[in-house]
Amino acid sequence: MRKIILCSPRGFCAGVIRAIQTVEVALEKWGRPIYVKHEIVHNRHVVDKLREKGAIFIEDLQEVPRNSRVIFSAHGVPPSVREEAEERGLIAIDATCGLVTKVHSAVKMYAKKGYHIILIGKRKHVEIIGIRGEAPDQITVVENIAEVEALPFSAQDPLFYVTQTTLSMDDAADIVAALKARYPRIFTLPSSSICYATQNRQGALRNILPQVDFVYVIGDTQSSNSNRLREVAERRGVTARLVNHPDEVTEEILQYSGNIGITAGASTPEDVVQACLMKLQELIPDLSIEMDLFVEEDTVFQLPKEL
């Protein structure tokens, strides 16, 4: 019988849960409005629900009245934003994911030691903008192997590399290999800076790909890790669609006769996954559902001390 194979783990990670709860608890404690620098996570369902509760999402701190509370999103901010918040008398609450903070700390430490940092990631992504702000004159962002080949440093220069936490493990591995080939002495962290949730969701998806011929990745188009999941499937020759609403699950699926894989990005609510699953079962009523467990997750991050 044809079936849906549902990846596990999928959806919310510990950093996303912490960020959302930070906004919710702040609203409960202090009432509306609570200002949030950037979307707290990259999913419009989450953002819309928090906006209904009284969160106001802004990009410029000038939009925040003096002496108000402002929450920094899970993606992190550059030091200049923290300084501006302090100068304007804002009460800052930091919802930056702890794994992103770890990368910030490493960059600061190695920059102070005199290293030039190679930052692997999407240069326009808010996480990369935040990390780069730690030492802008000592950081070069690279997105691909061609940019590695164009780097101006010598093999003897003191270099250190880290990655955006939500990259494709496949792409990151290729870029790192190119870096190490050019710069055998380059340093990095003892463990990957791609976060555990990104690795687990990509691993869970890779695990089911030999069994399916179509994959739905439930997630927002703005979500880096959701887009990377789609690319993981496509890189292995499996058709994949990134959808964020059941209306986007269309009759296109009727063209495919094999099993269907479903996963979800780290900022995707489970109720959206279930709604897409129901739509799929309406289109193909005789589908069975099988859960494929890749690894159990039990990571929990504490809320900011202000809460």
Curated annotation (Swiss-Prot):
Class of the enzyme per the UniProt entry, highest EC level: oxidoreductase
Gene field: ispH
Per UniProt, (2E)-4-hydroxy-3-methylbut-2-enyl diphosphate binds at H42, H75, H125, T165, S223, S224, N225, S267
- Binding of [4Fe-4S] cluster occurs at C13, C97, C195
**For binding isopentenyl diphosphate, which residues are annotated in this chain's numbering?**
H42, H75, H125, S223, S224, N225, S267
**Cofactor details (free text):** Binds 1 [4Fe-4S] cluster per subunit.
One annotated GO molecular function is: metal ion binding
Q: Single Gene Ontology BP term? A: dimethylallyl diphosphate biosynthetic process
**A Gene Ontology term for the protein's cellular component:** cytosol
Q: What is this protein called?
A: 4-hydroxy-3-methylbut-2-enyl diphosphate reductase
- Residues recorded as binding dimethylallyl diphosphate, renumbered to this chain, are H42, H75, H125, S223, S224, N225, S267
Pathway assignment reads: Isoprenoid biosynthesis; dimethylallyl diphosphate biosynthesis; dimethylallyl diphosphate from (2E)-4-hydroxy-3-methylbutenyl diphosphate: step 1/1; Isoprenoid biosynthesis; isopentenyl diphosphate biosynthesis via DXP pathway; isopentenyl diphosphate from 1-deoxy-D-xylulose 5-phosphate: step 6/6
Query: What's the catalysed reaction?
Result: isopentenyl diphosphate + 2 oxidized [2Fe-2S]-[ferredoxin] + H2O = (2E)-4-hydroxy-3-methylbut-2-enyl diphosphate + 2 reduced [2Fe-2S]-[ferredoxin] + 2 H(+); dimethylallyl diphosphate + 2 oxidized [2Fe-2S]-[ferredoxin] + H2O = (2E)-4-hydroxy-3-methylbut-2-enyl diphosphate + 2 reduced [2Fe-2S]-[ferredoxin] + 2 H(+)
Enumerate the UniProt keywords alphabetically: 4Fe-4S, Iron, Iron-sulfur, Isoprene biosynthesis, Metal-binding, Oxidoreductase
HAMAP family assigned to the protein according to its UniProt record, in alphabetical order? IspH
Residues the record marks as active site: E127
Cofactors that this protein relies on: [4Fe-4S] cluster
What is the recorded function of this protein according to its Swiss-Prot or TrEMBL entry?
A: Catalyzes the conversion of 1-hydroxy-2-methyl-2-(E)-butenyl 4-diphosphate (HMBPP) into a mixture of isopentenyl diphosphate (IPP) and dimethylallyl diphosphate (DMAPP). Acts in the terminal step of the DOXP/MEP pathway for isoprenoid precursor biosynthesis.
Question: What Enzyme Commission number(s) apply to this enzyme?
Answer: 1.17.7.4
